[in-house]
């Protein structure tokens, strides 16, 4: 019996994929599904060698032959072929921490839909810890400490990455949850629907997954096309929650498009104006009253500049 399926989208990153596979124990109840997203020929040859030298007995490789390219399409292919009772997602440039399996298997005989685990993060070049995981670790910390409605809503709808979550496979199938076929933020609506439909869930303070930061990943690549994809997904995200949550819950989340507007400025006036019109058309508020406070604006601007300068070396 396969208890756990680990689904990994891959594109041109065989060396880090090798590291990820080495972080997974070779147990009979684990299957690993790698879906290649039309890698370049050079990397396909390396991938073939990796297949031949792997120690994992339940390692399966698939190719994305659909008419959609991207991690979302690859993850959907992985879900279609997964046999495990539980699902973990991983990105090819990340890895699991030693002992992760002992933590996740504790939940195999439970009735949870989802179990959230804390991640950590490192700079791939220096090996130093980064801040990429902090938002998600804080969501878990706040929920475990406060356990109130606000911390629960934030855990459900702000933990928008697919990794560091153990998800019941039958829960995914029952609710027909899939990843979007978009260039960026393909995981946001998947995670949002997981948060909405789950009934029984748990949060663990054990760290099982390390996400890396490196040059050229989608999270550190600046392009108008990626911004527009994220903007459209944000509109879908906002609309879904507005239509499905009750008024009090939706208001508690305090969603607004301030961040999207600020991001659009990087690409010039026309993208900014286009984003403004699109957001207004969908009746998404641009800010909360606190942004009228000049001290808040200055503090926010300083934080944005600091973050940009800190991440500059990763940008293409």
Briefly describe each language-model feature range.
Residues 36-47, 68, 97:
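A conserved acidic beta->alpha catalytic loop
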Residues 207-215, 220-248, 269-283:
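Catalytic core of nucleotide-sugar-dependent glycosyltransferases
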Residues 10-26:
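Short, well-formed alpha-helical segments that are part of the catalytic scaffolds
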Residues 71-76, 92-197, 201, 212-225:
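Donor-binding/catalytic cores of nucleotide-activated saccharide
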Residues 26, 49, 267-316:
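Membrane-interface aromatic/basic loop that binds lipid-linked glycans or pyrophosphate carriers
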């Amino acid at each position: 019996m396969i208890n756990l399926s680990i689904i990994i989208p891959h594109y041109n990153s065989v060396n880090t994929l090798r590291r990820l596979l080495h972080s997974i124990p070779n147990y009979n109840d684990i299957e690993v599904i790698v879906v290649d997203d039309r890698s370049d020929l050079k990397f396909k040859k390396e991938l073939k060698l990796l297949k031949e030298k792997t120690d994992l007995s339940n390692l399966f490789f698939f190719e994305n032959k659909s008419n959609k390219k991207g991690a979302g399409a690859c993850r959907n292919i992985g879900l279609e072929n997964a046999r495990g009772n539980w699902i973990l997602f991983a990105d090819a440039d990340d890895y699991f921490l030693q002992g992760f399996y002992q933590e996740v298997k504790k939940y195999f005989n439970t009735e949870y839909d989802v179990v959230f685990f804390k991640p950590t993060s490192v700079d791939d070049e220096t090996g130093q810890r980064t801040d990429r995981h902090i938002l998600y670790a804080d969501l878990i910390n706040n929920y475990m400490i406060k356990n109130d409605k606000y911390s629960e809503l934030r855990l459900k709808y702000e933990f928008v990455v697919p990794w560091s979550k153990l998800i019941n496979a039958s829960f995914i199938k029952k609710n027909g949850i899939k990843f979007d076929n978009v260039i960026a933020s393909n995981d946001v609506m998947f995670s949002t629907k997981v948060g909405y439909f789950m009934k029984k869930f748990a949060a663990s303070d054990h760290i099982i997954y390390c996400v890396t930061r490196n040059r050229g990943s989608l999270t550190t690549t600046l392009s108008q096309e990626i911004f527009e994809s994220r903007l459209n997904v944000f509109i879908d995200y906002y609309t879904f929650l507005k239509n499905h949550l009750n008024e009090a819950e939706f208001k508690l989340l305090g969603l607004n498009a301030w961040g999207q507007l600020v991001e659009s400025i990087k690409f010039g006036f026309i993208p900014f104006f286009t984003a403004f019109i699109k957001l207004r058309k969908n009746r998404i508020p641009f800010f909360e009253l606190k942004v009228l406070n000049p001290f808040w604006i200055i503090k926010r601007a300083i934080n944005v500049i600091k973050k940009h300068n800190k991440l500059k070396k990763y940008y293409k």
